[in-house]
Amino acid sequence: MNKIQFILIVIICVLFGLIFPFVLPERFYADARPIVLDLYNEKGLIGSYPFTMLFYWITGLGKLPFSIVALIQLPILFFLLWLIGIPNRFAQINIKNCLIYLSFLMVSVFIGQPSKEFITFIFAAIIVYLFQYKYFS
């Protein structure tokens, strides 16, 4: 039941990620515009914004509409969460799980667009995943 609940929430969040760029005001995408447009050609390896601009330029995600970016990025993030593990009581409705469900919705808003947080989330998830093995911990 936990896995079914997780998959259901992931599907809902990805659908919200597809819809939000058409519904939310422009201020929600204030960080995404400079990353995608790169008006001053700041791409590079040093600094968070230049690295993010380089990442989205190399992958081509910066040229796609935000809803398509959400369709690509969100399943990657939720797959990383799946690899880390789903809690045993994830399907139970309680305050802690409701906060987790709401945080998943916030992820669909703020990471379903070109952002530095997408890259940060990937690195953090990889570190957590590696430390779950006794070989690395």
For each of these PLM feature ranges, what is it?
Residues 1-28, 33-137:
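Hydrophobic transmembrane helix bundles of membrane-integrated enzymes that assemble
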